Structures are given as C-alpha cells and as structure tokens.
Design a protein with these regions (language model features):
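Residue-level detector of structured alpha->beta connecting loops
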Residues: 10, 34, 62, 85-86, ...
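A conserved helix-loop-beta module that forms one wall/lid of the active-site cleft
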Residues: 38-101
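Internal nucleotide-binding/catalytic subdomain
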Residues: 105-227
C-alpha cells in the first residue's frame, strides 16, 4: 500500500524509520518499482532484526561484543543456564520486540522463568523463537546513530539512553524512557576506538557477507571498566 501511494503521488523520496517494515523488505519493494527510498534492504535489515545474527557477525569479524550463546531449543538453554552460566545474566529475544525483549536475570530461578516467558509462552511472539543468552556487563550505556551508504559510515553525536521503566531503573527495558545528548561518557578516545574497531568493521562485515547496508545503523555501546 505504501509503495502504491508513493507511486500514485509521485513521491520523490521515502524515508523508512520503523524496524518492522525494513525487516519485512519494504525497501526491496520500493526499489523494484524504481522508487527512491532511504533504508536498508531486507537482507541488511537483519542486522537489527536478529540479535543472534548480529552477535554471530560480530564474533566472526572480531568486533567487540559481550560473550554469548544462541539457542533455539528452550531445553538446551535451560541446561546451559544450570551448568555453565554466571549470574546475573542477560536473556534476549532474537527478533524485534519494541525494545522490550531483554531480561536481566539475577539468579537461576529468574533465568528459568525468563526462558519460559520468551521461548515457551512467546511473550514477544515469534521474536522469541531463538534466544540469545549474554554475559552481563556493567558500565555506561551510550547510543550512537550513523549514516551508512554501503561502504562509508558517518556517525552522529552520541546520546545517553535511559531504557528501564520506573524510578531508579527498577523496571524492565522499554523502547526508551528518555535520553540526552551528547553523552558525557563518550570521549574522544572512545570515539576513535569505536571508529576503528566497531563502526567501519561492521559496515565492512555486512558488505563481505553480501548484505551491503545503506541507511541508519544504531550502535548500542557499553563502556565498561575494561573498555
């Protein structure tokens, strides 16, 4: 319908902001009709659409990321949590969940309940068919948005994003409770490190995988005591 509207009304340029239509392939549809559109194609939008994919990509290309394991079987996830996990630990629904598909579990009991919630009860729908279990890291979270043309990346200013609901960060993650910019923790040294080891390597990795990314990439950084 959107492509029909753009065609009928001779829209010069369409900018897609929402994750869902990008992951669904709306850019491919527009391009197939010769319409100008800004955003990643379906095979590149998976970077945001699948946490398991993005974690595997970072691991393959040595881009810094928290230690993790991916699971598509809840029983195997539970075995891992009972035998190998260190707490607190983070459970993430693989797919899009409006920024809410992340659970921080303080102990095994909470983690077992989290697996049930994400993978069995499908609280986040098909987004929970696969789940990422990730090392819990403490530090300052910083968000950086960037413009990408498939090869070159230009970052915007940093932002301090507050995701958790309730006063004192007592609630669950949300799509965002508030933000301010720039972040005082995003120093010149951090910027230089990220440009060298995170930003450009991510663009290059996507191109190497045949998934050239054109659009805006969101980088969620965790600045820890170890870097």
């Amino acid at each position: 319908k959107l492509a029909d509207f753009a065609q009928e009304n001779q829209i010069d340029l369409t900018i897609i902001g929402m994750d869902d239509p990008l992951v669904g392939g709306i850019v491919d549809e527009f391009e197939s009709r010769g319409l100008r559109v800004f955003g990643p194609r379906k095979n590149a939008a998976i970077l945001e659409g699948s946490k398991a994919f993005s974690k595997d990509l970072m691991k393959k290309y040595n881009i810094p990321t928290a230690a993790y394991e991916n699971f598509d079987d809840p029983e195997k996830a539970l075995v891992y949590l009972r035998t190998e996990a260190k707490f607190p630990i983070v459970l993430k629904a693989d797919g899009l969940a409006l920024g809410k598909g992340v659970l921080i579990c303080q102990n095994l009991q909470e983690a077992e309940a989290g697996v049930k919630e994400i993978m069995e009860d499908k609280k986040f729908g098909s987004a929970g068919n696969t789940m990422v279990i990730e090392e819990f890291m403490t530090g300052r979270e910083v968000s950086v948005l960037s413009f990408v043309d498939g090869k070159t990346i230009k970052t915007m200013t940093s932002a301090q994003d507050h995701k958790r609901a309730k006063d004192g960060d007592q609630g669950l993650n949300t799509g965002g409770m508030g933000t301010f910019s720039p972040s005082p923790f995003y120093t010149k040294e951090v910027d230089e490190f990220c440009k060298k080891y995170v930003y450009q390597p991510t663009v290059d990795a996507m191109a190497a995988e045949g998934r050239e990314f054109k659009g805006i990439i969101f980088f969620g950084l965790m600045l820890t005591a170890d870097g």
